[in-house]
């Protein structure tokens, strides 16, 4: 991939390295990081190195009568942002609309004045949610201007935000479709809630988790379930599933997603990992009806805190999806004791960065 922003933008730090060398470098680094553990060869899973991001956020840079998208500078160039002409890592639907959208905004002082940021969310059908974030007072008068944008960009819905206020034109969600093991799953993805940014890699991660859980017995508990991204396909591998998430909005989406995918063996709970851990330890009637031998965790970058790690360690088998190898390494020092690491995968979610997403399957000896 080539991009006119390479060498200027601080996002794609590995821009000078061919993609196959990036994969080799990252996988070798992971191999060294986890050398203390007895585990199989690291499976390297990757997709396209361009047009892979279904979510993107850009600052807006105004100069005279022109406006530009802006990204943070490279570290060696100091703090701040720089204007960019294009971004080749974003989904094709986002890429195609970026320039024409900004040209329309430039023509309208009401839309342009104190526009601070533009966020994009896309789905596999090329539909978009575009969020305009302002550092000014915004009221209903902006509706006519947004209506004109919607007439121009018929595949997009718009959201206008300023501190404490939000206006939606016409909806704040997309329906995503993922093809997993030749079956289509549908997901409601709500703007400003977490969703996996790399659609292609997300499908491959879910397929990997399903493939490596085929022989697991008992029911499944999932922490940090979000909108049911892993929960819904994996529910086909287990008799019953109980899944928790602290975000009520995400739980509402997950419940809806289970319904539209005709999955009736999942119970979603709007609670933190700590709250669920207490229910489990207190042997709540809500919990005792499950045969909970398996747990799936997809925690934030901080990984598991001490209490969560202690709780997860009570389960026979663990499916751990990690967005931070350093905290994964720390957590495995506890979780790998008395368990065999049956599979370890590196998912290259973000080409041209040092980021490495990992998946680990641990089974009790």
UniProtKB/Swiss-Prot annotation:
GO terms for cellular component: cytosol. Disulfide bonds: none annotated. One of its GO terms (molecular function) is tRNA (uracil(54)-C5)-methyltransferase activity, S-adenosyl methionine-dependent. Its EC number is 2.1.1.-, 2.1.1.35. S-adenosyl-L-methionine binds at residues 196, 224, 229, 245, 298. GO terms for biological process: methylation; tRNA processing. SUPFAM superfamilies: S-adenosyl-L-methionine-dependent methyltransferases (SSF53335). Transmembrane segments: none annotated. It is an enzyme of class 2 (transferase). Keywords: Methyltransferase, S-adenosyl-L-methionine, Transferase, tRNA processing. Dual-specificity methyltransferase that catalyzes the formation of 5-methyluridine at position 54 (m5U54) in all tRNAs, and that of position 341 (m5U341) in tmRNA (transfer-mRNA). HAMAP family: RNA_methyltr_TrmA. This is tRNA/tmRNA (uracil-C(5))-methyltransferase. The gene is trmA.
């Amino acid at each position: 991939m080539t991009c006119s922003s390479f060498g200027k933008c601080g996002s794609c730090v590995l821009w000078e390295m061919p993609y196959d060398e990036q994969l080799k470098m990252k996988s070798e680094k992971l191999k060294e990081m986890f050398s203390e553990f007895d585990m199989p060869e690291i499976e390297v899973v990757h997709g396209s190195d361009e047009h892979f991001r279904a979510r993107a956020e850009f600052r807006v840079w105004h100069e005279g009568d022109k406006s530009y998208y802006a990204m943070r500078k490279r570290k060696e160039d100091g703090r701040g942002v720089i204007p960019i002409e294009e971004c080749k890592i974003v989904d094709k639907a986002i890429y195609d609309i970026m320039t024409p959208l900004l040209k329309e905004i430039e023509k309208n002082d009401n839309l342009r004045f104190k526009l601070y940021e533009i966020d994009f969310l896309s789905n596999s059908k090329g539909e978009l949610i575009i969020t305009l974030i302002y550092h000014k007072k915004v009221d209903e008068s902006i509706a006519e201007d947004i209506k004109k944008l919607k007439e121009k960009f018929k595949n997009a819905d718009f959201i206008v935000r300023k501190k404490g206020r939000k206006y939606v034109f016409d909806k704040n969600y997309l329906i995503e479709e993922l093809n997993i093991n030749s079956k289509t799953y549908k997901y409601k993805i709500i703007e400003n809630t977490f969703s996996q940014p790399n659609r292609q890699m997300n499908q491959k991660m879910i397929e990997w988790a399903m493939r490596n859980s085929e022989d697991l017995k008992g029911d499944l508990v999932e922490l940090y379930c979000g909108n049911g991204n892993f929960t819904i396909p994996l529910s086909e591998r287990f008799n019953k599933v109980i899944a928790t998430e602290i975000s009520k909005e995400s739980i509402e989406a997950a419940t809806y997603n289970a319904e539209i995918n005709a999955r009736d063996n999942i119970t979603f709970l709007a609670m933190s990992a700590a709250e669920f851990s207490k229910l489990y330890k207190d042997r709540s009637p809500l919990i005792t009806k499950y045969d909970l031998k398996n747990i799936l965790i997809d925690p934030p970058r901080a990984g598991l805190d001490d209490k969560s790690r202690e709780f997860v360690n009570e389960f026979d088998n663990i499916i751990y999806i990690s967005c931070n190898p350093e905290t994964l390494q720390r957590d495995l020092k506890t979780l790998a004791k008395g368990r065999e690491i049956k599979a370890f995968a590196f998912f290259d979610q973000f080409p041209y960065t040092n980021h490495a997403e990992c998946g680990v399957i641990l089974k009790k000896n």
